[in-house]
Structures are given as C-alpha cells and as structure tokens.
Amino acid sequence: QSTDDSVLFLKEKFPDVNVIINPSNEGFSTGYNLALKQVNAEYYVLLNSDVEVTENWIEPIITLLDSNKKIAACQPKVLDYNLRSRFEYAGASGGFIDKYGYPYCRGRIFNVLEEDKGQYNNAEEVFWSTGACMFVRAEAFWKVGGFDDDYFAHMEEIDVCWRMKNIGYQ
C-alpha cells in the first residue's frame, strides 16, 4: 500500500479518477491484472508513472491497432528522460528474443543505448513491447489470461507478448 500522500493527492486533485487501492503490493503483473479487470475498453495503455509523453502520442498507435486486428501489442519509441537523444533502457523501441532465449531490443544492445537518429521511426513488427509504455488489445490480453502473476516485476511483458504470438497475434 502507498506510504506517501499520492492517494490523497489523486483524490483531491482528480476527483473523477477511480483510484484502486489494493491491500498489499502484489507486483506489476497482479496489480495490472486487478486494475484492468475493472476497465471496459478495446485497448489498454499501460504507462509507467515515470514516463513523459508528447502531445498527440496516442492517436497514431490507436490508428495502427485499428488498421490490423491481428496486432495485440505495440509501443512508441521510448527515449531517455535525461538524455533525450538516446533510447531508454527499458524497452527502447520494441524487442526480440535471440536463439538462446535472451531478450534484446531495438535501440539498445546489452547496456549500450543507441542515439535516436530516426532509424526506428517505421512501424515494424517486434516480438515484445515494453511494459513501460505498452498498448495492448484487451481481447488478446484476456485470451491468454493477462499477465502471469508469477512475475512480480520485469519480463512479464515479454511473457504476455509471447503467449499472444502463440495464439496468432502480432
């Protein structure tokens, strides 16, 4: 449970926002699963609290999802907040799995972050989208049972994307 005044702040400043208070911190996967069960939407936008978005950032991705019903999850480029010319470590521009089962992503090789020179401005199929800023089709998400609650934090987005791919989604 939150130990700062963030819940009070939300209730006072944003009274129309439905605040979900869980009795304990069960982790990223369980927390999102519990929250998303209360949301009636075609798409979910999962956004970490430390991600800053730009104006009109949602529309192009919703247009992409609307254009192809086989797309289960996607993301925008995620750039480093402090060094905006470089990709962010967590997910950068979507990821893949190598032949040894190791996840990697566009915009980052191991701990080396690439400079954003527009090389990933194209819409391209990736194996997984980052949970830091993930758009996901609700129908596909629930067809695979949502996030696996065994993942407290990290790699849950790779797992759910893998399971959605296994049933025919991109």
What label would you give each PLM region?
Residues 76, 94-126:
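Short, flexible, basic/aromatic active-site loop/helix in glycosyltransferases
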Residues 1-8, 24:
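A conserved acidic beta->alpha catalytic loop
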Residues 121, 127-170:
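A short, conserved alpha-helix in the catalytic core of glycosyltransferases
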Residues 26, 51-52, 78, 151:
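Acidic metal-phosphate-binding loop of nucleotide-sugar-dependent transferases
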Residues 21-39, 49:
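Glycine-rich, basic loop-to-helix element that forms the pyrophosphate-binding segment
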Residues 52-102:
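Conserved donor NDP-sugar-binding/catalytic core segment of glycosyltransferases
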Residues 5, 9, 30, 34, ...:
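Alpha-helical elements of Rossmann-like donor-binding domains used by nucleotide-donor carbohydrate transfer enzymes
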Residues 44:
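Short aromatic/hydrophobic "clamp" motif used to bind/position activated sugar donors
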